[in-house]
Amino acid sequence: MASFEIMIASQPPCQQCRSSKRYLTKNGTPYLETKYKDDSSAQALAAANNYTAAPVCYVVDKRTGDVLSHWAGFNMYRLRQWVNNYKEEVGE
């Protein structure tokens, strides 16, 4: 089990949200999906960083609750980075 959790705060309809989820699923990396309108953490990150695109994605350390990384929209580089981190931690 990984020491972090990938969160995707999405909005319907959202192609970048679907693409982000599809990429993680295709690569065997678990994530938690929330609705942006109900996710106060995602809203705070979006406001603090002037994010205007969906989804708002963030990675949380399961032990401390700290946000390790965050971005908005479909970001292949960031997604690949966290897929690789996940595979490294779980020994794939």
Language-model regions: role of each:
Residues 1-29:
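Local sequence-structure signature of Cys/Sec-based thiol-disulfide redox active-site neighborhoods
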Residues 18, 22, 43, 80-81:
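Alpha-helical elements of the RecA-like P-loop NTPase motor core of helicases
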Residues 60-92:
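Non-catalytic, surface beta->alpha helical segment in thiol-disulfide oxidoreductase systems
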Residues 15, 40-41, 77-78:
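Short alpha-helical
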Residues 34-53, 63, 82-90:
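Thioredoxin-like thiol-disulfide oxidoreductase module
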Residues 15, 52, 74:
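Residue-level signal for short amphipathic helical patches enriched in basic/charged
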Residues 55-58:
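Cytosolic beta-strand hydrophobic patch enriched in CBS
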